[in-house]
């Protein structure tokens, strides 16, 4: 994948470093000339909401006038300020809100995930939201070897929820925890328990490293929310309550189905498609919330859960006005 001229020049410099060598580029020089000279700094191409939130927590009010090492676009700063106001982290006069904004700034997460954890405490499903945030913070939890495609699909079906991907992730995490609990009863040795979990992951086509990472993230975030005094509760099997909580947390990422089967992201107005990896891919619900927008040849939404569209105006009236 061609990135920029500077990186390609660095690669060329490796030829001949340890001994005689040559560098061959499998593209024309005119293509090289079209590339950017260097990588655009991350702060100029990423969501700045967490950066802005942390600066506000440090008492810095003038974000636009702040002396960044690399100045991000003004529009990106304004967009982040607007998002933080909608999430309740900032007041209308751009001050850090109390308690929500202060709580969000204490969590080492994307502000939307931080808000999700705070909201879930009110909805009495913090345990489930901890799982979802942890699982979304790591690489894909599923793996599908080409030579065992059908077996992997069959194994995944045992975890799938007809309500969407978030609850599917909860099901995987709960099943893994049950496996660990069983092995703990059989043997108190940690190494034996990890071997049992590794074997369970292999049998169910779950990425063991990703799952272990998710469990570590879960433990870390749980420590933060407990220090903040949030109510660590579970909704059990009441997934309607959990989906309502997801709506209240991720209302900025809602999409509604169009007559042609595509979706329209309500926050941006973009036409988007459901990613084939979603458990809802073949069902096409009327309204969903999602966590990720992937741009390839098309705009795809990933990590999706079906919701009732009426919940949007009920749970996020600051963003969705109802029509008389």
Which residues make up each language-model segment?
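Second RecA-like catalytic domain
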Residues: 27-324
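Conserved segment of the helicase C-terminal RecA-like domain
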Residues: 1-35, 49-53
């Amino acid at each position: 994948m061609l990135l920029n001229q500077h990186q390609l020049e660095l690669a060329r410099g490796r030829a001949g470093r340890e001994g005689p060598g040559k560098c061959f580029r499998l593209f024309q020089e005119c293509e090289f000339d079209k590339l950017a000279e260097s990588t655009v700094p991350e702060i100029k191409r990423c969501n700045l909401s967490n950066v802005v939130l942390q600066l506000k927590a440090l008492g810095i009010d003038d974000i636009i006038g702040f002396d960044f090492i690399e100045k991000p676009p003004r529009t990106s700063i304004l967009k982040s300020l607007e998002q933080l106001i909608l999430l309740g982290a900032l007041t209308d006069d751009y001050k850090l809100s109390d308690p929500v904004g202060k709580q969000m700034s204490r969590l080492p997460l994307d502000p939307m995930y931080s808000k999700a954890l705070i909201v879930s405490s009110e909805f009495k499903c913090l345990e489930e939201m901890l799982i979802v945030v942890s699982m979304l913070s790591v690489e894909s939890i599923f793996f599908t070897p080409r030579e065992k495609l059908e077996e992997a699909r069959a194994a995944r079906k045992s975890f799938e929820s007809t309500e969407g991907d978030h609850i599917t992730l909860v099901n995987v995490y709960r099943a893994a925890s049950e496996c660990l609990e069983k092995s703990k009863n059989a043997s108190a040795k940690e190494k034996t328990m990890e071997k049992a979990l590794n074997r369970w992951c292999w049998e169910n086509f779950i990425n063991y490293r990703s799952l272990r990472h998710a469990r570590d993230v879960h433990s870390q975030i749980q420590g933060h929310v407990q220090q903040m005094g949030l109510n660590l509760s579970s909704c059990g099997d009441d997934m309607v309550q959990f989906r309502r909580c997801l709506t209240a947390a991720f209302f900025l990422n809602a999409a509604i189905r169009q007559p042609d089967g595509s979706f329209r992201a309500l926050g941006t107005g973009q036409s988007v498609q459901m990613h084939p990896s979603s458990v809802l891919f073949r069902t096409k619900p009327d309204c969903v919330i999602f966590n990720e927008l992937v741009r390839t040849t098309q705009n795809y939404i990933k990590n999706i859960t079906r919701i009732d569209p009426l919940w949007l105006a009920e749970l996020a009236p600051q963003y969705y006005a109802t029509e008389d």
